[in-house]
Regions:
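Active-site glycine/GP-rich loop and adjacent strand/helix microenvironment
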Residues: 25-44, 58-70, 162-163, 167-170, ...
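Conserved adenylate-forming
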Residues: 126-174
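Short polybasic/polar patches that bind polyanions
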Residues: 83, 141, 283
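A conserved hydrophobic position in a structured secondary element of the catalytic/binding core
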Residues: 20, 73, 232
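Active-site diphosphate/adenylate-binding microenvironment
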Residues: 54, 58, 70-73, 77-124, ...
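Intrinsic disorder/low-complexity segments
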Residues: 1-28, 314-368
Length: 452
């Protein structure tokens, strides 16, 4: 697949079918949603998104409100919630006024505009065994957008580092894991011939490492000059570290190797402070601490955030990556890859010495003091639980996300995570005990009764 750039002045407009009295199409995919998703994907591939505050909002706001109008009319559960809150396409004047759905509501209601016959995948949250998980339904078009968002967001932050060693089960064993799908997408896009999964499902249906295969792979990687990237959850790395400690073993991975750690512990291992975990990983794998990064995501989203230290370590690549002008595609400065990714190799030669770099000094099992950043088609707001309003810079609140890539679900998501605004990014503090901000209560029973 090649990168198809929008023609100069290209604009996708929608007919007035999103009027207040528009009927909901239940038995086939809505053409307007498909068109919006295709347009958004073109913008991602062409690097048409910008980060500058004023210009970025002028671009993001109309897209967010257009998507809200579509989701209001074609996502029945979401439309009911918005109507109860008095929010309609006619009353919402700015994207920040769009109602957010708590992640807990995804356990009770189907927030989707995809007809059942066209659903090809569903991602579940990784909650406590026996509990109803959150559900995020996908179709071919939504997965294509998800994977474009993933690859376009991952590369500028993390770059390429040869082979991929993935510490999760393969998709066949974990078909409802968005994290496994994420890693498999990276495998197919960046290392289809060399990447391998080294996790498996245990007897208790939990994830565990396939150590008889993993250890020889790490030995071979240590003896090679080709960099390797390890992808895995925090608890998978703890399992690996504990085994290496018991055997008094260490590896020395090649220069340029990296680690992406995500997903938390899920009660699958002992819990380590983030700084201690990363120090142990660096020591046991022979890496510099700067080579270890974090990712923040969830099954309800279609975009991911990465810690800002990753982009700073790459010379500030991510901060400028998304403002490329598509005309460069024909000038030789950019080259399209299979899947439509566009790379500017010159950016990777920039030195990190000229950029400020946040230092990870985590104090608990979350990524405290690691600052995360989403791609420019997603926005983060920190909401005060007491007032329901946006918290000031440096104040603690609940993380609210607005992900345009969630075209066929709900773009505005209220998480249960606490965070602090840090410039254009945020600091993750952990899970809130009382996670619902004022003004965001959701009567699930009422919505269910209105759907019947």
């Amino acid at each position: 697949m090649t990168c198809r750039l929008p023609r100069p002045g290209f604009q996708l407009t929608y007919p007035p079918a999103v009027a207040e009295n528009q009927p909901i199409i239940k038995h086939r995919m809505n053409a307007e949603l498909l068109a919006f998703a295709a347009h958004l994907r073109e913008l991602m591939l062409a690097r048409r998104f910008t980060r500058g505050a004023g210009e970025s909002d002028r671009q993001f706001d109309p897209l967010a409100r257009e998507l809200f109008a579509l989701q209001f009319h074609h996502n029945p559960a979401y439309g009911k919630i918005c109507a109860v809150r008095g929010a309609t396409p006619a009353t919402v004047r700015h994207w920040s006024d769009i109602p957010a759905v708590p992640t807990a509501a995804f356990k009770e209601l189907e927030f989707t505009s995809i007809p059942p016959a066209e659903r090809t995948a569903v991602f579940h949250s990784s909650g406590t065994t026996g509990q109803q998980p959150s559900r995020h339904f996908h179709c071919a078009a939504s997965l294509a957008l998800y994977e474009t968002s993933l690859c376009q967001g991952y590369e500028p932050h993390f770059g390429f580092a040869g082979r991929l060693v993935i510490l999760t089960p393969p998709p066949a064993q974990a078909p409802h894991s968005s994290l496994v799908h994420m890693f498999d997408t990276l495998r197919r896009q960046f290392a289809p011939d060399t990447a391998q999964f080294f996790g498996q499902m245990g007897a208790d249906a939990g994830w565990e490492l396939d150590l008889p295969r993993l250890l020889p792979a790490l030995t071979n990687a240590s003896q090679s000059a080709e960099p390797v990237t390890l992808l895995g959850t925090a608890f998978s790395f703890v399992h690996l570290l504990d085994y290496l400690a018991s055997e008094n073993r260490r590896f020395k991975l090649p220069p340029g190797s990296r680690v992406l750690e995500t997903g938390g512990y899920k009660n699958r291992s002992r819990t380590l402070p983030k700084a201690e975990l990363h120090a142990l990983i660096a020591d046991c794998l022979g890496l510099a601490p700067a080579a270890i990064g974090c990712e923040y995501g969830m099954s309800e989203l279609s975009s991911q955030a990465y810690d800002c230290a990753l982009s700073a370590d790459m010379g500030g690549f991510a901060s400028e990556f998304f403002s490329e002008i598509s005309a460069k595609a024909g000038s030789g400065g950019l080259r399209p890859l299979a899947g439509g990714e566009i790379l500017d190799k010159a950016r990777r030669s920039q030195t990190a010495a000229t950029r400020s770099k946040p230092v990870a000094t985590a104090k608990d099992d979350f990524c405290r003091d690691v600052y995360f950043e989403f791609p420019p088609w997603a926005r983060v707001r920190i909401i005060s639980p007491e007032t329901g309003r946006e918290a000031a810079e440096g104040e603690t609140g609940l993380i609210r996300l607005h992900d345009l890539a969630n075209v066929f679900s709900v773009a505005a998501i209220q998480t249960e995570d606490l965070g602090i605004r840090r410039g254009g990014g945020f600091e993750l503090l952990g899970r809130a005990t009382a996670a619902e901000p004022r003004g965001c209560s959701l009567n699930v029973g009422e919505v269910k009764s209105q759907q019947t």
